[in-house]
């Protein structure tokens, strides 16, 4: 369910050493399955463990996950990264905003999942997003851009070189991607 790197485990173990004995960590999702879903990690003292929690045992600690958050934390990764600027804890949860769909789910659901879990997190850095409007009988995914992508001068490059390449690679049954957006350049546009 959740992978916690050795570096992150060591970081948590150091923090937990200063807490009440038996305290572990809790990994959770606020607003799971929603576009504004957020993941978090908190201390979990022994008296805060619920009977319905899933206990994930690691070498240096145990991570508790509540039953509502569990499906949205599938394939989540926690790491502790150090670079020239310092160190930081990273939590990647590709399924937090949308549950992972089955490999045999309808094409529309699988493409929507790829957009929400892989593409929109990248576009969010520019205040943008993309939505799947339909998949035509000819096999074209019809997308609509919003936020900072609407009116952005780089949207064609993003569509053809980024999104289309990624979707065609992942879904060979697609023939291409089309943009339905009526782009209006403005203050909201990224470029």
Curated annotation (Swiss-Prot):
It holds the Pfam family NifU. Signal peptide: none annotated. Keywords: 4Fe-4S, Iron, Iron-sulfur, Metal-binding. Gene3D superfamilies: Fe-S cluster assembly (FSCA), HesB-like domain. The keyword 4Fe-4S applies. GO terms for molecular function: 4 iron, 4 sulfur cluster binding; iron ion binding. Its cofactor is [4Fe-4S] cluster. It comes from the Bacteria. Binds 1 [4Fe-4S] cluster per subunit. The cluster is presumably bound at the interface of two monomers. GO terms for biological process: iron-sulfur cluster assembly; protein maturation. [4Fe-4S] cluster binds at residues 149, 152. Belongs to the NfuA family. Homodimer. This is Fe/S biogenesis protein NfuA. It comes from Salmonella paratyphi A (strain AKU_12601).
């Amino acid at each position: 369910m959740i992978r916690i790197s050795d570096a992150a485990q060591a970081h948590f173990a150091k923090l937990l050493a200063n807490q009440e004995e038996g305290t572990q960590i809790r990994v959770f999702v606020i607003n799971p399955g929603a576009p504004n879903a957020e993941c978090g990690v908190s201390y979990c003292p022994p008296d805060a463990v619920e009977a319905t929690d899933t206990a994930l045992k690691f070498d240096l600690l145990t991570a508790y996950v509540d039953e509502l958050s569990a499906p949205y934390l599938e394939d989540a990764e926690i790491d502790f990264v150090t670079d020239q600027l310092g160190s930081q804890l990273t939590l990647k949860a590709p399924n937090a905003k949308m549950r992972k769909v089955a490999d045999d789910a309808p094409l529309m659901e699988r493409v929507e999942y790829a957009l929400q879990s892989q593409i929109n997190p990248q576009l969010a850095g520019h205040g943008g997003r993309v939505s799947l409007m339909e998949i035509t009988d000819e096999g074209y995914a019809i997308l609509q851009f919003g936020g900072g992508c609407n009116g952005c001068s780089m949207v064609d490059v993003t569509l053809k070189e980024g999104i289309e390449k990624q979707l065609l690679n992942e879904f060979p049954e697609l023939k291409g991607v089309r943009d339905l957006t009526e782009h209006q350049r403005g203050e909201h546009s990224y470029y």
